[in-house]
Design a protein with these regions (language model features):
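Nucleotide-activated chemistry modules centered on ATP-dependent adenylation/adenylyltransferase
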Residues: 1-244
Length: 244
């Protein structure tokens, strides 16, 4: 269920309807059901090792993992929004999901979000500190297909380590969108912001605005098109970013 947004153009929505046809076909494939069952078993296995929480970002992958956890009987969930650089539409996904699925939910906003040329954009350090206080064990939507770093993580560690669970680590992006369609789960509006299909939705990330990572596919231009007011507000607080 794509969440409506005034950011969407007519051409964006026309393209999204075409994508939904493919999502619907993949959602009916028996292979997806097998992947769902396996992911639920991984989460239950991880739970047998001790308390943990689902790490939310409200992007497509974390919504899938949150729903799989809910189906497995697990309810503990936390979000660590990145303060003033957080994508503002993540709250729409949060509200739509929690209105339908009862979770033991909390969130801690980062007081010192980072926008730099190194590491993660956003609130990675705040996440690490807060997750340690919560016991340090968590399940996330990390997938090998997203980056070379995450692929290495899956190759080296597999789906589960002592403190982390990547239940959908080997799912494709097509699998993720098919699952969202199959279970009518809320989908972040940004994934339909494709300039009428000229941008691959699989490249779009929804975590933060104004960051320096992942700009190779045209992230800055995309943000200027769809989040201009938010970008101006960030530049006003951090003028050094304007020239980057």
């Amino acid at each position: 269920m794509l969440l409506a947004s005034p950011r969407h153009t007519v051409h964006d929505l026309e393209h999204w309807k075409r994508l939904e046809i493919a999502d619907s076909m993949r959602a009916r494939h028996p292979g997806l059901a097998h992947k769902e069952d396996a992911a639920i078993q991984r989460l239950r296995s991880f739970a047998s090792g001790g308390n943990f929480f689902v790490s939310a970002s409200w992007g497509k992958d974390s919504v899938v993992v949150a729903h799989l956890a809910w189906r497995s009987g697990w309810r503990r969930m936390h979000w660590f929004p990145a303060g003033f650089i957080e994508n503002p539409d993540c709250h729409l996904v949060r509200d739509a999901f929690l209105a339908r699925f009862e979770m033991d939910y909390s969130e801690i906003e980062a007081a010192d979000p980072v926008v730099g040329d190194w590491g993660h954009d956003g609130a990675q350090r705040a996440f690490e500190r807060a997750s340690a206080k919560m016991g340090g064990r968590y399940a996330s939507g990390v997938r090998a297909e997203e980056s070379a770093t995450r692929k290495r993580r899956m190759v080296v560690f597999g789906h589960e380590t002592e403190n982390t669970c990547a239940a959908i680590g080997w799912w494709s992006t097509d699998d993720v969108f098919a699952y969202l369609h199959k279970h009518d789960l809320p989908i972040h509006p940004a994934y339909a912001c494709t300039r009428g299909g000229t941008i691959d939705r699989n490249r779009i990330r929804v975590g933060t605005i104004g960051g320096q990572g992942g700009t190779g596919w045209g992230r800055r231009e995309w943000e200027r098109t769809y989040y201009p007011a938010e970008l101006r507000a960030i530049y006003a607080r951090m003028p050094s970013l304007v020239q980057r």
